[in-house]
Structures are given as structure tokens and as C-alpha cells.
């Protein structure tokens, strides 16, 4: 969070081909407050080294462009971390994304390509896995939404917002699922209006339900 909230990607110099050396280093993050991917990854590794947490810098490509990020070991399992891609561009003060925080090789390889001897298969410390509103199957998803709808009805509130994160499979399938639940909720929840908006990352669909 500190790195994302207190620095920004050196986009101006990147698009103009004028990236200074310091933006490739941890100094770019901690002193100049601006850097490119290898500056982010170097700064993250420095923090992990100080904390005594095993960490490596991984290089490869992100969406076909040369890129650098990190692998970190927690409780004997490796995870992939891409701080650069979790920092919004252009800079959005106060906003931190967690789509690339402690994810597996399988998820990282959806838009990153690389060769590494490290096998990142850890899931316990993935950001979303630590949240009660993250689901990998529709059964738990339904139960959670029904619970939140019931709580809202019982409390007597006129408007309610429920945010969930779902393991995304395929956008058309996900859309059908959202529409089906919307129709179901209109009948069972006694709300006059129920709608949703969604945002996709490489593997997570965030759905915001607004009820009134």
C-alpha cells in the first residue's frame, strides 16, 4: 500500500523514451516518488529483504512488453506480486488495486510471460482469498448475497450496496450468471430495484450490487 499510495508510475518519461536511471531503482520510489517497473520491483525486494522475507525479482513480459515484478515466499509457498500493475495509471490518489498481490503462476501467466525456476502455487495469502466476499463457486456466492440481502431487509434500510469478488471464468458466462441472480433477487428480496456493475482484472470479477 505504501508504495502505491506514495509514488506513481513514470509514465511521462516512459512514453517519451526519456526514463532517467533513477526511475529504474528503489530510489525512484522512495525518494523521487516515481519509477518504472524495475524501480517498483527493486523497492519491493528491498522491503522484503529488510523484513527477512525471501523475495526475488522476476523478469519477462507483461502484455508483450518487457517487464519486471516479484516472487515472494510466505510460510514456505511462493506467490507472484506485481506492484507496478496494482498502481493505477494515470495516478489515482488513494486507490490501490490488489489484482496482482500474492497470486499464483497460473493467474500471472494470463497476461505475463516468463521463465522461472520458482513455482508460485500459494493461495492462502492472496489478497482476495483473505476477504469474506471472495468466492470461487456459485453456491457460496448465492449464500453470501442472500445473507446480505436478508440483513438489509431486516435492518429496514431503503438502500443497500453489496460488493463481491468472484473467480472469473468467461465474461459471457459471468454475465449470464449476474443476470440470472438479478432476476431471482427481484422476486425474492422485495426490492423495487436491483442492479449491478462489474469490473474485470486478469482473474477477478468485482460486482457491485445496488439495491433500493
Please provide the spans of the model-predicted regions.
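Secondary-structure boundary elements
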Residues: 1-29
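Hydrophobic/aromatic-rich core segments of domains that either
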Residues: 39-106
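Low-complexity, Gly/Ser/Thr/Pro-rich intrinsically disordered linker/tail segments
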Residues: 92-208
Amino acid at each position: 500500500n505504501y508504495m502505491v499510495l506514495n509514488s506513481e508510475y513514470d509514465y511521462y518519461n516512459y512514453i517519451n523514451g526519456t526514463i532517467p536511471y533513477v526511475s529504474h531503482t528503489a530510489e525512484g520510489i522512495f525518494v523521487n516518488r516515481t519509477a518504472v517497473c524495475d524501480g517498483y520491483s527493486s523497492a519491493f525486494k528491498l522491503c522484503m529483504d529488510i523484513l527477512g522475507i525471501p523475495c526475488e525479482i522476476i523478469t519477462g513480459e507483461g502484455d508483450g512488453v518487457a517487464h519486471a515484478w516479484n516472487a515472494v515466499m510466505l510460510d514456505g509457498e511462493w506467490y507472484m506480486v506485481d506492484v507496478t500493475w496494482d498502481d493505477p495509471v494515470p495516478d489515482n490518489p488513494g486507490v490501490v488495486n490488489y489484482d496482482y498481490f500474492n497470486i499464483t503462476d497460473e493467474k500471472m501467466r494470463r497476461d505475463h510471460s516468463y521463465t522461472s525456476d520458482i513455482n508460485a502455487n500459494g493461495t492462502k495469502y492472496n489478497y482476495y482469498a483473505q476477504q469474506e466476499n471472495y468466492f470461487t463457486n456459485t453456491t457460496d456466492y448465492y449464500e453470501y448475497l442472500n445473507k446480505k440481502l436478508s440483513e438489509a431487509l431486516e435492518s429496514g434500510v431503503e438502500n443497500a450496496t453489496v460488493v463481491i469478488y468472484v473467480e472469473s471464468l468467461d465474461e459471457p458466462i459471468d454475465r449470464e450468471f449476474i443476470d440470472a441472480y438479478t432476476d431471482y433477487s427481484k422476486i425474492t428480496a422485495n426490492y423495487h430495484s436491483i442492479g449491478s456493475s462489474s469490473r474485470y482484472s486478469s482473474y477477478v470479477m468485482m460486482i457491485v450490487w445496488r439495491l433500493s
